[in-house]
Swiss-Prot record:
Documented EC number(s): 2.1.1.146
Name of the protein: (Iso)eugenol O-methyltransferase
Cystine residue pairs: none
The keyword Endoplasmic reticulum appears for this protein: no
Function: Catalyzes the methylation of the para-4-hydroxyl of both eugenol and (iso)eugenol to methyleugenol and isomethyleugenol, respectively. The resulting products are part of a complex mixture of low-molecular-weight volatile compounds emitted by the flowers to attract pollinators.
Reactions accelerated catalytically: (E)-isoeugenol + S-adenosyl-L-methionine = (E)-isomethyleugenol + S-adenosyl-L-homocysteine + H(+)
Organism name: Clarkia breweri (Fairy fans)
Additional observations: (iso)eugenol O-methyltransferase (IEMT) not only has distinct substrate specificity from Caffeic acid 3-O-methyltransferases (COMT), a highly homologous enzyme, but it also methylates the hydroxyl group at the para position rather than at the meta position as COMT does.
Enzyme class: transferase
PROSITE patterns on file: SAM_OMT_II (PS51683)
Amino acid sequence: MGSTGNAEIQIIPTHSSDEEANLFAMQLASAAVLPMALKAAIELDVLEIMAKSVPPSGYISPAEIAAQLPTTNPEAPVMLDRVLRLLASYSVVTYTLRELPSGKVERLYGLAPVCKFLTKNEDGVSLAPFLLTATDKVLLEPWFYLKDAILEGGIPFNKAYGMNEFDYHGTDHRFNKVFNKGMSSNSTITMKKILEMYNGFEGLTTIVDVGGGTGAVASMIVAKYPSINAINFDLPHVIQDAPAFSGVEHLGGDMFDGVPKGDAIFIKWICHDWSDEHCLKLLKNCYAALPDHGKVIVAEYILPPSPDPSIATKVVIHTDALMLAYNPGGKERTEKEFQALAMASGFRGFKVASCAFNTYVMEFLKTA
């Protein structure tokens, strides 16, 4: 045996940064555990149970949560503790330690600030359905084809399913409902903020929400501006699940063939699904459907020119990667790229009017 002074058996990094780099590499290698653990917690309604069972800044034990689940599994509290411990390490939930009479230390958990958006708000919506959409098996499969798409060309989603994402929705009713719920929930939260920040809907008579899903956004616009008549325009298999809303007409069709006429056309999170060529075709259809004083209101992320490590930038870059995996030419764009699309489509004016939860509201104006 060597002595403790023998340098050959000392485990000391050559540089302190080596330790950090190794840990970062290990974290990246296991990074998939976070969204999948959060997915399980959401599917089990763990966060909703916590929201209903404890006061703000309060705590609850895994055993108390497990008692409210439809399970007889004696290991459920221990398994929940391990899931919640993971979520606590990422500040999704908070924790405190409690010493039991036996001397054992028990972890108790509470809701962290992010849970405001992962549990139902006063409107009954949260971002939980959006997370369930993003982690659905249908949307995980294309990632296994990204390498092939880079080497051979094509779109990972198409390679996985033999068709584009939008056509696939019409073949899978389960996933179509999951997707619509996820998009509707996300839209409702973001749109509520947009309506607080942006006043460009004032004075309109008719607005067309292109790619409006099941009509949640159109209904919110009409609720704030009752004098507006709204047309919710999307593919037929999308609006088949759309509920009736006062002041909203659902129309099925293909936006690349044409769009309904209105004083203004609203397009939220649509351009990033498509290539520049597709966007130009859509925007030219919008231009033709508008009166001389009309405008297209575009709500999208704006891609920063540099990949800085801020959360806001990471969200945009994450979404750009999703577009790379799923959509035909879809991508996030810089402000200059949006302005170029507007000008190339015939619009004379362009401005960034507002921002809500990282979604920028831009106006493409027929007259400058």
